[in-house]
Design a protein with these regions (language model features):
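Cytosolic juxtamembrane N-terminal segments of multi-pass membrane proteins
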Residues: 1-12
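Membrane-embedded alpha-helical segments of integral membrane proteins
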Residues: 11-71
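Structural detector for short beta-strands of small beta-barrel domains
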Residues: 114-135
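A short macromolecule-binding patch
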Residues: 148-154
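OB-fold/S1-family single-stranded nucleic acid-binding modules
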Residues: 176-196
């Protein structure tokens, strides 16, 4: 944490820096481990607006603290020139904005859906896809109308993928739903009569 504060930083500065770090870690946790939440389309613009407002507000508040000398910059950053400080500020603003969008658009709505949502079932036409590469969420996933989300990936095992036809087929999704979106809890092949 020395990059966030000096040994003489105030308790408020330490608290705010810790809250920002936890906010960033929450978004990183979602990106790495959770991909089963499909947000409602109406949630996109409000979550983006909240994310931009939050990241901009926090950045302006920290800048104001730096200019008033109530926020003491760490020793590593105090030697930077104006160009490096500006680039670092823009990078921090983008990172905080992206993390805020993940948290307000995916992580918090997913948590609320888990707590207040109700169980439901839906069927959909999907295809399976094999993922290649070192950095992937899972080896096999489903593609359907709901998988259009940037951070949505419903994983299936190799046996499900190999048994699936190459064209679109019908699946039954067990979900937990709320007005914010739905969480895909389980996937099973729909009965033959639902296949098209």
């Amino acid at each position: 944490m020395p990059r966030f504060w000096t040994p003489h930083a105030s308790a408020r500065q330490r608290l705010v820096a810790t809250a920002i770090l936890l906010w960033l870690l929450g978004a990183a946790f979602y990106l790495l481990f959770i991909h089963d939440f499909v947000p409602d389309e109406a949630l996109f613009w409000p979550s983006l607006g909240i994310a931009l407002g939050l990241s901009g507000g926090v950045t302006l508040w920290v800048l104001q603290g730096i200019s008033r000398k109530t926020w003491v910059v760490g020793d590593d950053l105090s030697g930077y020139g104006i160009k490096k400080k500006t680039l670092l500020l823009l990078a921090c603003l983008l990172l905080l904005g992206f993390a805020s969008w993940i948290n307000t658009g995916y992580l918090i709505p997913r948590y609320l859906t888990r707590v207040i949502g109700s169980s439901a079932e839906r069927s959909d036409l999907v295809t399976t896809r094999k993922h290649y590469g070192k950095h992937r969420t899972c080896d096999y996933s489903l593609d359907g109308r709901w998988s259009r989300g940037l951070l949505v990936s419903v994983c299936v095992d190799a046996a499900f993928h190999q048994a699936a036809p190459r064209q679109a087929f019908s699946v039954r999704l067990r979900t937990r739903e709320s007005a914010l979106g739905f969480i895909v809890e389980a996937v099973s092949r729909a009965p033959a009569m639902l296949n098209r």
